[in-house]
Regions:
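Structural signature of PLP-dependent enzymes
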Residues: 58, 256-260, 279-302, 329-331
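PLP-dependent enzyme catalytic core of the Aspartate aminotransferase-like
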Residues: 155, 338-347, 353-385
């Protein structure tokens, strides 16, 4: 008798769009501006420190919460960047990437039947983690033109079942950033409630035009109820290493670690020592990251002006949204496949970031975390649209 496979726990989930488009790009020899990974080298100092860590014997299980030397370095960086003192022992947990940290945070505090508010468009790992926790995602759309938060709509979405609110700044896919006024609105909304917060800040150092990243760590009244998530992969151009971390108050960290220890237990040990050395000895790397990517953004946007694609503003992050309505009226998922197969440039549609995409929206996401030669090759093809 055939084995009876139980019904899927994630009926709305298929293969992630990032994998789909990267595979399509490889099959058709397209320039891949879809998936958000750099195609230039990681800092040589980081490679040297990784090699040193392995040669010095840091090759066995790291402590479950993370190597002490890295947690101490993160605490020093948080104090330097945001003026916040965090306890490296009780408040910092090193994770196998930011996605693991987000999953852990949701599963640490959300119970079946509860609700999690998600601001759409949102990174596609949020909703499956919520569903696997037996909870329901309540999706509140951002302004379709500016990707600003409508705080009245967020307030209207709060119910007695609301346990968690997810925020992301700088925002993927738009690059929009929370302002100080947004943080005050957020604090007022959560004050006196049982609602907790996950703040996805993986692009924290990639901010442009003199803006300030409003980390939740700057706001004590928010920090006391928050998991703040970041990623070394985004900061040091090494997305394949999959190392991130979460900062939360001791009581929340204790619950977070209960999930973490039975999920991955610990994270790649040599990389933890390498990142600790980089934070300690080369703080200028994250301090200069915004200028590094702003130069790429400005050059790429200037080139896009010579195409029929309309670039939207990019305050932070390393993605450029483009309006393709002058090129095609195809839905975005069809347009990006056509663009990849017929024109040789891979992009990401916006619809997978939404529960209910805005009708008639014609936007695609391009990644400019690439070598100039890669971007030039893409622009040459886009100019032919």
């Amino acid at each position: 008798m055939p084995v009876q496979i139980p019904p899927t726990k994630l009926p709305r989930v298929g293969t992630t769009i990032f994998t789909v488009m990267s595979q399509l790009a490889a099959e058709h020899g397209a320039v891949n501006l879809g998936q958000g990974f750099p195609d230039f080298p990681v800092p040589q100092r980081l490679v040297d420190e990784l090699d040193r860590a392995m040669r010095e014997g840091h090759n066995q299980y790291a402590p479950m919460t993370g190597a002490p030397v890295l947690r101490q370095a993160i605490a020093a960086k948080v104090l330097r960047c945001y003026g916040a003192q965090v306890d490296p022992d009780g408040e910092i947990t090193v994770t196998s990437g930011a996605t693991e940290a987000i999953f852990n945070a949701i599963h640490a505090v959300v119970r079946p039947g509860e609700e999690v508010i998600v601001l759409d468009p949102a990174y596609d790992c949020y909703e499956p983690a919520i569903e696997l926790a037996g909870a329901r995602g309540v999706h509140v759309p951002l302004d379709p033109a500016t990707f600003a938060v409508d705080w009245e709509r967020v307030r209207a979405a709060v119910t007695p079942k609301t346990r968690l609110l997810m925020i992301n700044s700088p925002h993927n896919p738009s690059g929009a950033m929370f302002s100080a006024d947004d943080m005050r609105e957020l604090a007022a909304l959560l004050d006196g409630t049982r609602i907790l917060l996950v703040s996805d800040e993986v692009y924290e150092h990639i901010v442009f035009d003199g803006r300030r990243h409003e980390s939740v760590l700057r706001w004590p009244q928010l920090r006391e109820r928050a998991f703040v998530v970041s990623s070394f992969g985004k900061t040091y151009h090494c997305t394949g290493w999959k190392v991130g971390y979460a900062i939360a108050p001791p009581a929340l960290s204790a619950e977070f670690r209960k999930v973490h220890q039975y999920n991955v237990f610990c994270t790649f040990a040599p990389a933890q020592h390498a990142f600790a050395a980089m934070i300690r000895d080369e703080p200028e790397h994250d301090q200069q990251l915004g200028a590094f990517y702003q130069a790429k953004r400005d050059r790429f946007r200037g080139q896009l002006l010579g195409t029929r694609l309309k670039p939207l503003p990019v305050p932070g992050g390393y993605f450029q949204l483009v309006d393709y309505s002058e090129v095609s009226d195809l839905p975005d998922h069809e347009f990006v496949k056509w663009l990849t197969i017929e024109k040789g440039v891979a992009a990401i549609p916006l619809s997978p970031f939404y529960e209910n995409p805005p009708p008639g929206q014609r936007l695609a996401r391009l990644c400019f975390a690439k070598n100039e030669a890669t971007l030039d090759a893409a622009i040459e093809r886009l100019q032919a649209l």
